[in-house]
UniProtKB/Swiss-Prot annotation:
Phylogenetic classification of the source organism: Bacteria, Pseudomonadati, Pseudomonadota, Gammaproteobacteria, Pseudomonadales
GO cellular component, one term: cytosol
Post-translational modification: Transiently phosphorylated on a His residue during the reaction cycle. Phosphorylation strongly increases the affinity for substrates and increases the rate of nicotinate D-ribonucleotide production. Dephosphorylation regenerates the low-affinity form of the enzyme, leading to product release.
Function noted in UniProt: Catalyzes the synthesis of beta-nicotinate D-ribonucleotide from nicotinate and 5-phospho-D-ribose 1-phosphate at the expense of ATP.
Pfam families documented for this protein: NAPRTase, NAPRTase_N
UniProt pathway: Cofactor biosynthesis; NAD(+) biosynthesis; nicotinate D-ribonucleotide from nicotinate: step 1/1
The name this protein goes by in its record: Nicotinate phosphoribosyltransferase
Gene Ontology terms: biological process: NAD biosynthetic process via the salvage pathway
Organism: Pseudomonas syringae pv. tomato (strain ATCC BAA-871 / DC3000)
NCBIfam families associated with the record: NAPRTase, PRK05321.1
Length: 407
C-alpha cells in the first residue's frame, strides 16, 4: 500500500533548514549579534490561507520544542568552518515565539518577524515549509508518496532520452527545495530517489537535516538578506555590497565562495565585484533574469579582469527544472563551470497540484527599510517605495516599466 505524503511533525529538527541560514547565522553571531531586523510573509498569488491560521500557529509552537541533539552537533563539528563558539551557541538555541506575530489582516494571512537578527534568522525556511505543508494537508489530503516518486522517474526518463551520456556525466544538480516543499516526506523521498537513480550528478542538498540523514553534502553560502541588511549596516549605501562581501571574506577566508549578484542588479553588483573579490570568490549565483544573458555578462567580467572563466563556477537557482538546466548547461558547456539548484520542481511537483507561491523577506534592518531590486521587475521587494527610489538613484539603476511589488 502506498504511503501518505504527510507526517505529524512538519519540521523535523533545527537542521531541517537551508544550509545558508547556518552559514549566515554564524557570521551574524560574530559581527552583528545585537542588530534588530523585521521580516514579512507574502503570498504572491493571493491564495486564501486564512483557514489554516490555527494549525500554522500550532506548528510554530512545535518549533520551540526543537534543539540540537548530540548527533547533530557531531555532524556540524565535521564542517571545518563551523567555529566552536557558534556550535556552542547553536547547542543552546531555541526558537522563541515572542519574535513571531501571526494574524489575519485585510482578509489575508499575516506573518511578521521582529527581533534580533541572530534569533530571527532561522525562522524563515521552517515557517515557509509549515505554511506550504499545512495548506497541502487541507487541499490535497489523499496525496501519496508514490505520486511524487513516479513523477520524478518520468523526469529521469526524459533526461536520459534527451541528454547524451557525456552530458549526463557533467550535469551537476542539487536539491534546493526545502522552503516550498509539498511536505517533508516528499522532500525526503525525492532525495532518496535522486541519490539512488538520478542519471546526472547529484552534488548535494541545501537541507542540512537530510544531508546528514542521507550522507549528502550540505550546500549553500549566502542569501539576499545578507546583502540587504548591509544597506543599513555599512557606512554608506553605495558601499553596502562591498561591506557585505568584505565581511563575508573576513568570516570565511575564501571558503563558501559563491556570491549572489541580483540584490540590487547584476550590473550594480559587477561594478563592485573587482579583481580582489573575483579572485577570492569561487563563483556567482543566478536568481533572476535571463540565465544565459546573465552568464555571458559574468564570463565577460571575468575575462576583462584577466581571470579564466573555467576556473570559476556559476550556480543557477531561479525557477529551474531539468529541461531548463540542460538548455543552460549546453549554452555554457566548456566556457565556465555550471551547477543547478532545483527547488519547487523537485519537491513540490505532483500532477494536478499547484505549489505555493510565497516569500518571507527581510523588510527592515536596524529600524530602517531594506530592499531587493533584482534583475526582474516582479521580484522587487520593499515596503518603502521612497527607499527603492533612493537605492535606484545611488546605484544608477533605471526605473523599470512595471511597478515594484510590495514585500
Amino acid at each position: 500500500m502506498s504511503e501518505s505524503a504527510f507526517s505529524n511533525r512538519i519540521v523535523q529538527s533545527l537542521l531541517d533548514t537551508d544550509f545558508y541560514k547556518l552559514t549566515m547565522m554564524q557570521a551574524v553571531l560574530h559581527n552583528y549579534p545585537n542588530v534588530d531586523v523585521e521580516w514579512e510573509f507574502r503570498c504572491r498569488n493571493g491564495e486564501d490561507l486564512r483557514p489554516y491560521l490555527g494549525e500554522i500557529q500550532h506548528q510554530i509552537e512545535l518549533l520551540c520544542e526543537l534543539s540540537l541533539s548530540p548527533e547533530h552537533l557531531v555532524f556540524l563539528e565535521r564542517i571545518t568552518f563551523m567555529k566552536p563558539d557558534f556550535l556552542r551557541f547553536l547547542g543552546l538555541f531555541r526558537f522563541n515565539t515572542r519574535y513571531v506575530k501571526t494574524s489575519i489582516e485585510n482578509d489575508e494571512l499575516c506573518i511578521r518577524l521582529h527581533g534580533p537578527w541572530l534569533h530571527v534568522i532561522l525562522f524563515e525556511v521552517p515557517l515557509l515549509a509549515i505554511v506550504s505543508e499545512v495548506r497541502n494537508r487541507h487541499r490535497y489530503p489523499d496525496t501519496l508518496l508514490s505520486q511524487a516518486r513516479d513523477r520524478l522517474y518520468d523526469k529521469f526518463e526524459w533526461l536520459t532520452v534527451n541528454a547524451t551520456p557525456d552530458e549526463l556525466a557533467e550535469l551537476k544538480v542539487a536539491d534546493f527545495g526545502t522552503r516550498r516543499r509539498f511536505s517533508y516526506r516528499v522532500q525526503e523521498e525525492v532525495l532518496n530517489v535522486l541519490k539512488l537513480d538520478f542519471p546526472g550528478q547529484l552534488v548535494g542538498t541545501s537541507n542540512v537535516h537530510l544531508a546528514r540523514q542521507l550522507d549528502l553534502k550540505p550546500l549553500g553560502t549566502m542569501a539576499h538578506e545578507w546583502i540587504m541588511a548591509h544597506q543599513q549596516l555599512g557606512p554608506r549605501l553605495i558601499d553596502s555590497q562591498i561591506a557585505a562581501l568584505d565581511c563575508w571574506v573576513r568570516e570565511y577566508r575564501g571558503l563558501l565562495g559563491i556570491a549572489l549578484t541580483d540584490c540590487i542588479t547584476t550590473d550594480a553588483f559587477l561594478n563592485d565585484f573587482d579583481l580582489y573579490f573575483a579572485k577570492l570568490f569561487d563563483g556567482l549565483r543566478h536568481d533572476s533574469g535571463d540565465p544565459v544573458k546573465w552568464a555571458e555578462k559574468c564570463i565577460s567580467h571575468y575575462q576583462k579582469l584577466g581571470i579564466d572563466p573555467m576556473s570559476k563556477t556559476l550556480v543557477f537557482s531561479d525557477g529551474l527544472n531539468l529541461p531548463k538546466a540542460l538548455d543552460i548547461f549546453r549554452a555554457l558547456r566548456g566556457r565556465i563551470n555550471v551547477s543547478f539548484g532545483i527547488g519547487t520542481n523537485l519537491t513540490a511537483d505532483i500532477p494536478g497540484i499547484a505549489p505555493m507561491n510565497m516569500v518571507l523577506k527581510m523588510t527592515a534592518c536596524a529600524g530602517q527599510a531594506v530592499a531587493k531590486i533584482s534583475d526582474e521587475s516582479g521580484k522587487t521587494q520593499c515596503k518603502d517605495p521612497n527607499f527603492v527610489a533612493y537605492l535606484r538613484h545611488v546605484f544608477k539603476v533605471p526605473d523599470l516599466p512595471s511597478p515594484a511589488k510590495p514585500a
